[in-house]
Amino acid sequence: MATIKEIQQRLELVTELSDSFLEEVAKDQRSGVQKAVEKRKKAIQAELDEDLRLDQMIRYEKELYQSGYQAIAGIDEVGRGPLAGPVVAAAVILPPGCKIKGLNDSKKIPKKKHQEIYQAVMDKALAVGIGLMDSDIIDKVNIYEATKLAMKEALSKLPLKPDYLLIDAMKLDVEIPQESIIKGDANSLSIAAASIVAKVTRDRLMADYDKEFPGYAFAQNAGYGTKRHLEGLEHYGVSPIHRKTFEPVKSMLG
């Protein structure tokens, strides 16, 4: 009779719920074997669920590639709501049929996974472009217009020219066919890829700003109005990267 450890090692190689070995060892009444079988079944089911989720997330891209488009860029931004720092946009072109495990709306990805998934996107993408508009531009033109400018800059930085755009809840006045998708970062893998690239890029920038302007906890809050950030504003006043048209910064400046 095989040991529990031997069975566990063999189970690691099983990739289908219908595998005969899985059915065979399920009859083994030892509790260690039963636990190993259940664990493997759950892992296989999780893989199947993830593959199905990713299939759903590439449906826009799949239809467009089947229609003859050859370079589809997903575009998204991060940083519309913070009191400080830039708004950052990214444009990403993934290869046709590309699936990246764990890639989702960046707000749904655990923080500890951000770097890993960002790197997977950077490794697999055919092209990546990044655009940012700082607080001065945000104050000058408003956050909505600054977001569009950041997206257009990200688009212009792509080393490969896209022939179709999938954009998260926004339309751009550019001569490229496009679709605006509500909650795009949860429904299109290309937009989700742009979302995590923009998120990690902005978080790194804010961590750098934290060293330049200590006291606001920018490395932790990325410029959002947390308790520590607001306390920093009260104590140190307004920094050069604060958005002067955003409350409570605006009121502090009189």
UniProtKB/Swiss-Prot annotation:
Catalytic activity annotation: Endonucleolytic cleavage to 5'-phosphomonoester
Subcellular location(s) of the protein: Cytoplasm
A Pfam family per the record: RNase_HII
Cofactor binding note of this UniProt entry: Manganese or magnesium. Binds 1 divalent metal ion per monomer in the absence of substrate. May bind a second metal ion after substrate binding.
Cofactor(s) in the UniProt record: Mn(2+); Mg(2+)
GO cellular component, one term: cytoplasm
UniProt key word Cytoplasm: yes
SUPFAM superfamilies named among the record's database cross-references: Ribonuclease H-like (SSF53098)
A molecular-function term among this protein's GO annotations: RNA-DNA hybrid ribonuclease activity
Entry's family note: Belongs to the RNase HII family.
Name of the molecule in the record: Ribonuclease HII
Originating species: Streptococcus gordonii (strain Challis / ATCC 35105 / BCRC 15272 / CH1 / DL1 / V288)
